[in-house]
UniProtKB/Swiss-Prot annotation:
Domain of life the protein comes from: Bacteria
Encoding gene, per UniProt annotation: rplR
UniProt entry tagged with the keyword Ribosomal protein: yes
Species whose genome carries this gene: Bartonella bacilliformis (strain ATCC 35685 / KC583 / Herrer 020/F12,63)
Known partners and oligomeric status: Part of the 50S ribosomal subunit; part of the 5S rRNA/L5/L18/L25 subcomplex. Contacts the 5S and 23S rRNAs.
One Gene Ontology cellular component: cytosolic large ribosomal subunit
UniProt-listed InterPro entries: Ribosomal_uL18_bac-type (IPR004389), Ribosomal_uL18_bac/euk (IPR005484)
Name of protein: Large ribosomal subunit protein uL18
A Pfam family matched in the record: Ribosomal_L18p
Function per UniProt: This is one of the proteins that bind and probably mediate the attachment of the 5S RNA into the large ribosomal subunit, where it forms part of the central protuberance.
Top-level taxonomy: Bacteria, Pseudomonadati, Pseudomonadota, Alphaproteobacteria, Hyphomicrobiales
Cysteine disulfide links: none
GO biological process: translation
Length: 120
């Protein structure tokens, strides 16, 4: 019997494998979603370092948002990560949704990042 944790890990590996094949040297926009907050970071897998990051726990975000776990918060994080990526000179990324379904908060973050100028 396969546990739900193993299914999630397998799905994340499958998505990561597809991203690695399509990356062509582009950094990846990785999303982590918890029950309370949402986090995004742009990672350069070639050098193994984080180029930009944003989350709902940052001081400016915490004060302006009612909750860190809704679509508005995800949209704000998407806008912020796109802004920080632009400052770092990053225009193209590969979107890494991990094991999460492209729906709800993950989709809101992706659309905000696209609206902010990132292309993927």
């Amino acid at each position: 019997m396969v546990s739900s944790k193993e299914i999630i890990q397998h799905r994340a590996k499958r998505v990561r494998r597809q991203i690695k094949a399509a990356a062509n040297g582009r950094p990846r926009l990785s999303v982590y979603r918890s029950n309370q907050n949402i986090y995004a970071q742009i990672i350069d897998d070639v050098r193994g370092c984080t180029l930009a990051s944003a989350c709902t726990l940052e001081e400016g975000m915490k004060k302006s948002l009612r909750s860190g776990s809704d679509k508005k918060a995800a949209f704000a994080v998407g806008k912020l990560i796109a802004e920080r990526a632009k400052k770092s000179g990053i225009n193209e990324v590969v979107f890494d949704r991990g094991a999460y379904v492209y729906h709800g908060r993950v989709k809101a973050l992706a659309e905000a990042a696209r609206e902010g100028g990132l292309s993927f």
